[in-house]
Amino acid sequence: MIMNTFEDLFSEYAGRITDTVNEQESVFIQYCKLFSSIITDSFYVLDIVQKQFCYIKPDNLFLCDHSVEEAMRLGHDFYTQIIHPDDLPLWTNILKIIPQYLDRKDKWNEIDYFSCTLRLLRKYSFSSHFLSQMVYQRMKPICLNNNLRYLICIVEN
């Protein structure tokens, strides 16, 4: 029920987001903050077209000791900082396959979400090396004007 309401609100405001001072984005970001406060998992929204994050819950599971500001600044390149190098090709392929799959409009009703399991790189104070942490990620596609525009992502361990 919450996801349907979220998707409705997201679709309504996401198509009108143009810059960070935009009133619609402000409402959308406030809704993301509210939604992320009631879930225990990491949560973020990725703009597929601009390869930037729209929102990132300030949660260390996804951020891996990086700041929200750093992730927002790096955008799509942030994944190279946190995903294990052996899993990065998998993630890159997933981001290519989702739009290709959704290009087939007849498949839209078959898809609730996409998912994958991959390793994130963690830096711990007791180790001089990065350690891997396996996480499960769900990605809900949001289409605007019949084109994939956003992925609503939940990361859990």
Residue ranges of predicted features:
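Acidic/polar residues at beta-strand termini and the immediately following turn/coil
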Residues: L46-D47, L121-K123, N157
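PAS-family sensory domains
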Residues: S67-F130
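PAS-family sensory domain signal
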Residues: T20-F78
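Short acidic, gly/pro-rich beta-turn/loop elements at beta-sheet edges
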Residues: F53, S128, K140-L144
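Conserved beta-strand and immediately adjacent loop positions that scaffold enzyme active sites
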Residues: S42, Q52, T117-L118, Q133
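N-terminal start-of-chain detector that recognizes signal peptides
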Residues: Y13-D19, S26-V27, K51-C54, L61-F62, ...
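PAS-family sensory modules
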Residues: M1-S42, Q133-N157
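Short low-complexity stretches enriched in small and charged residues
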Residues: M1-M3, F10-S11, Y44-K51, Y55, ...
